[in-house]
Amino acid sequence: MSVNYAAGLSPYADKGKCGLPEIFDPPEELERKVWELARLVWQSSHVVFHTGAGISTASGIPDFRGPHGVWTMEERGLAPKFDTTFESARPTQTHMALVQLERVGLLRFLVSQNVDGLHVRSGFPRDKLAELHGNMFVEECAKCKTQYVRDTVVGTMGLKATGRLCTVAKARGLRACRGELRDTILDWEDSLPDRDLALADEASRNADLSITLGTSLQIRPSGNLPLATKRRGGRLVIVNLQPTKHDRHADLRIHGYVDEVMTRLMKHLGLEIPAWDGPHVLERALPPLPRPPTPKLEPKEESPTRINGSIPAGSCLEPCAQHNGSEPASPKRERPTSPAPNRPPKRVKAEAVPS
């Protein structure tokens, strides 16, 4: 549970702004905004989604800074509520909608701050996914960097040894690597994984549309990645119930439950949300399915650049690293703005934890 995850982190005073009031768009305005989102998705050639804890609350996993989030309740001296475990949590409508958007070629890359493993367990291809803060179900060999996707949480946090050894052999007949396996969960001051951050940065810079779902964008550098899309002339859509750090940069802001927004989006695009049939790991994306017929998305009078008084696409933005003293200190270490792209994919082995 995110409660146990949060409790396992080192003490850290500045967790950002917690418990901000939620905003709900009226039904007609919500429908109009989702219509605009569908038009943007269909007309864009390189769409990148960025997800946060808000997309998993419908599965019973609490978020962190929402009205009943883990850290919000902690600030109030109250115990957070939870309804499930990481192992028993099921992917939400949003998780499964993202799977289908990738299958038909409308989603090029997915960047996630979540550690709950639901993207991988939903069947989203790992070669199109960057998990910037780790995955509770994944451990990695410290020697050869092979990753193992388990069917239960690995049991440690903070890049610590899990007590298991790597079983991969470099070639037939050779002995196993036997390197020490470690969890992939970051603590506050740990550096983000180089490969995942490089891929996320490259995808964000190449995107002509970045869409954030269920994140307040307060954690750096993860929360600043969507701004790379804006600096390159792309558009930014923010879907969140609470105000976010980068609202002023958004071309379109949608205040509604993420599952409702994604369900309406899929309907406008003429796509079905697939049912989840149990956890399975997909290492590489399959050939894309045929796109559905072009939806009826004729232009409306009000463009997304004017909704909520947002700034037009292409306007000058401040650099990601520029912050004033009023913003929370960075819980994640800053990285160069242009890390080396096109790193080779990690070797991955999926198996159950030995009994």
Curated annotation (Swiss-Prot):
Give the N-acetylserine positions (modified residues): S2
Record flagged with keyword Signal: no
Q: Which GO terms describe its cellular component?
A: chromatin; chromosome, subtelomeric region; endoplasmic reticulum; nucleoplasm; nucleus; pericentric heterochromatin; site of double-strand break
Q: Where does NAD(+) bind?
A: A53, T57, F64, R65, W71, Q113, H133, G214, S216, N240, Q242, V258
Q: Which Pfam families match?
A: SIR2
Domain Deacetylase sirtuin-type residues, every copy: 27-272
Q: What happens when the gene is disrupted?
A: Monkeys die soon after birth and exhibit severe prenatal developmental retardation. The molecular developmental stage of the monkeys mimics that of wild-type fetuses at 2-4 months of gestational age. Neuronal differentiation is strongly delayed, due to hyperacetylation of histone H3 at 'Lys-56' (H3K56ac), leading to up-regulation of the long non-coding RNA H19.
Q: Which residues carry this modification: N6-acetyllysine?
A: K33
Q: Report the locations given in the UniProt record.
A: Nucleus; Chromosome; Chromosome, Telomere; Endoplasmic reticulum
Query: Where in this protein does the record say Phosphoserine is found?
Result: S10, S303, S330
Q: Where is the composition biased (Pro residues)?
A: 287-296
Q: What is its main location?
A: nucleus
Q: Region (Disordered): which ranges?
A: 284-355
Where do the catalytic residues lie?
Answer: H133 (proton acceptor)
Q: How is the protein modified post-translationally, according to the record?
A: Acetylated at Lys-33. Deacetylation at Lys-33 by SIRT1 promotes homomultimerization and binding to double-strand breaks (DSBs) sites. Phosphorylation at Ser-10 by MAPK8/JNK1 in response to oxidative stress stimulates the mono-ADP-ribosyltransferase activity on PARP1, leading to PARP1 recruitment to double-strand breaks (DSBs).
Q: The organism sits in which domain of life?
A: Eukaryota
Family matches, as InterPro entries: DHS-like_NAD/FAD-binding_dom, NAD-dep_sirtuin_deacylases, Sirtuin, Ssirtuin_cat_dom
Explain the regulation of its activity.
Answer: Compared to the defatty-acylase activity, the protein deacetylase activity is weak in vitro, and requires activation. The histone deacetylase activity is strongly activated upon binding to nucleosomes and chromatin in vivo. Two molecules of SIRT6 associate with the acidic patch of one nucleosome, while the C-terminal disordered region of SIRT6 associates with nucleosomal DNA, leading to efficient histone deacetylation. The protein-lysine deacetylase activity is also activated by long-chain free fatty-acids.
Sorted alphabetically, the Gene Ontology BP terms of this entry are: cardiac muscle cell differentiation; circadian regulation of gene expression; determination of adult lifespan; double-strand break repair; ketone biosynthetic process; negative regulation of cellular senescence; negative regulation of gluconeogenesis; negative regulation of glycolytic process
Q: Which GO terms describe its molecular function?
A: chromatin DNA binding; damaged DNA binding; DNA damage sensor activity; histone deacetylase regulator activity; histone H3K18 deacetylase activity, NAD-dependent; histone H3K56 deacetylase activity, NAD-dependent; histone H3K9 deacetylase activity, NAD-dependent; lncRNA binding
Might you give the EC number(s) for this enzyme?
2.3.1.-, 2.3.1.286, 2.4.2.-
Partners and quaternary state? Homodimer; binds to nucleosomes and DNA ends as a homodimer. Interacts with RELA; interferes with RELA binding to target DNA. Interacts with SMARCA5; promoting recruitment of SMARCA5/SNF2H to double-strand breaks (DSBs) sites. Interacts with the mTORC2 complex; preventing the ability of SIRT6 to deacetylate FOXO1. Interacts with the CLOCK-BMAL1 complex; recruited by the CLOCK-BMAL1 complex to regulate expression of clock-controlled genes. Interacts with CSNK2A2; preventing CSNK2A2 localization to the nucleus.
According to its UniProt record, which protein family does this protein belong to?
Belongs to the sirtuin family. Class IV subfamily.
Supply the PANTHER family for this chain: NAD-DEPENDENT PROTEIN DEACYLASE SIRTUIN-5, MITOCHONDRIAL-RELATED (PTHR11085), NAD-DEPENDENT PROTEIN DEACYLASE SIRTUIN-6 (PTHR11085:SF12)
**What this chain does, per the record?**
NAD-dependent protein deacetylase, deacylase and mono-ADP-ribosyltransferase that plays an essential role in DNA damage repair, telomere maintenance, metabolic homeostasis, inflammation, tumorigenesis and aging. Displays protein-lysine deacetylase or defatty-acylase (demyristoylase and depalmitoylase) activity, depending on the context. Acts as a key histone deacetylase by catalyzing deacetylation of histone H3 at 'Lys-9', 'Lys-18' and 'Lys-56' (H3K9ac, H3K18ac and H3K56ac, respectively), suppressing target gene expression of several transcription factors, including NF-kappa-B.
Q: What name is this protein filed under? A: NAD-dependent protein deacylase sirtuin-6
Write down the species. Answer: Macaca fascicularis
